[in-house]
């Protein structure tokens, strides 16, 4: 196994065979897990999480289909936000389909049950064959043409505000800690901010409210973003007004499943955020009802039994972007 510093890996970085004109992001339906493919203008690729294993290879096949649509034949960086089954479970099959140059994670597994140990051992068996990066808050992932900043990992968050950030957050006054907040691998999630010139997208994995609070209270260490990938599949234990109001997104993406994530309270908080125009969802959230789901054009998969359609976001240097729904070919520019 080679464990390299990010600086050393940057020196060794090479562009992939496919070169995108702009930043392209594919939000892949893995039924309430996560898998997001970033294709940089340089052609380098970052895959964040691999969805579930099992289900007759469902999620790796969907990842492969999105990669084919993007013209991607290899993964330069595979980032595993944490070691839960819905984020790392599909790795075995994904690794059979694509060469993976570097593996990024938060460090040791923190859950000691049998299944968690099996998943972590599976992950390390692949990571040890290549380049493994244990990323920490403040690190930069070396993808050409993008600034990919690690904001959270291994239970820690960014120590100081990013350049241009650091404004007081008035919503912090109403924050109340959740006495029932879980302590699990979710809290260890790697969270990243990707900047492409004037475009910024935030993805905090499965972080929940206390770590969101640490990133934006009493000072907003992040600043504002164009797009927010709703935390924890738009779960009720995350997506606090303290975070979402502070980052002031124009668009939110929910990587929810038909019966996982997409919680009404979280949806409403995001929906009511000043300046937000739209929420795009990977699935219609069955338990949330019409009042807490977006209109059909903004949902990639309406039926519970579906083909696993994806959403694609294309961002320009000037900060403008568009989102495309592969189910109905609907596209909207921002």
Which positions does each model-derived feature cover?
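Non-globular, low-confidence helical/coil segments that flank catalytic cores
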Residues: 6, 17-334
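Sec-dependent N-terminal signal peptides
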Residues: 3-13
């Amino acid at each position: 196994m080679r464990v390299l510093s990010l600086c050393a890996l940057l020196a060794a970085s090479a562009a992939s065979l496919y070169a995108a004109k702009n930043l392209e992001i594919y939000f892949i339906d893995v039924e309430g897990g996560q898998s997001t493919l970033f294709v940089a203008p340089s052609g380098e690729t970052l895959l964040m999480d691999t969805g579930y294993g099992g289900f007759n290879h469902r999620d790796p096949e969907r990842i492969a289909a999105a990669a084919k649509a993007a013209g991607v034949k290899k993964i330069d960086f595979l980032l595993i936000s944490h070691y839960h089954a819905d984020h790392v479970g599909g790795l075995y099959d994904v690794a059979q389909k694509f060469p993976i140059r570097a593996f990024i994670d938060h460090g040791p597994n923190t859950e000691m049950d049998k299944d968690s140990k099996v998943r972590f051992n599976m992950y390390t068996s692949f990571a040890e064959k290549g380049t493994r990066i244990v990323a920490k808050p403040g690190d930069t992932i070396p993808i050409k043409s993008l600034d990919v900043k690690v904001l959270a990992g291994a239970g820690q968050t960014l120590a100081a505000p990013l350049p241009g950030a650091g404004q007081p957050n008035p919503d912090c006054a109403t924050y109340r800690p959740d006495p029932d907040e879980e302590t699990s691998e979710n809290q260890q999630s790697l969270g990243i901010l990707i900047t492409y010139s004037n475009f910024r997208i935030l993805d905090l994995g499965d972080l929940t409210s206390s770590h969101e609070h640490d990133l934006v209270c009493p000072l907003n260490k992040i600043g504002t973003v164009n797009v927010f990938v709703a935390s924890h599949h738009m779960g009720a234990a995350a997506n606090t007004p303290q975070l979402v109001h502070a980052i002031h997104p124009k668009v939110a993406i929910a990587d929810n499943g038909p019966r996982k994530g997409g919680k009404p309270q979280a949806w409403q908080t995001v929906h009511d955020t000043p300046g937000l125009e739209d929420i795009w969802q990977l699935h219609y959230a069955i338990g949330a009802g019409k009042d807490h789901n977006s209109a059909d054009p903004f949902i990639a998969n309406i039926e519970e039994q579906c083909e696993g359609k994806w959403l694609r976001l294309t961002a320009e240097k000037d900060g403008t972007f568009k989102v495309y729904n592969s189910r109905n070919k609907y596209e909207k520019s921002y």
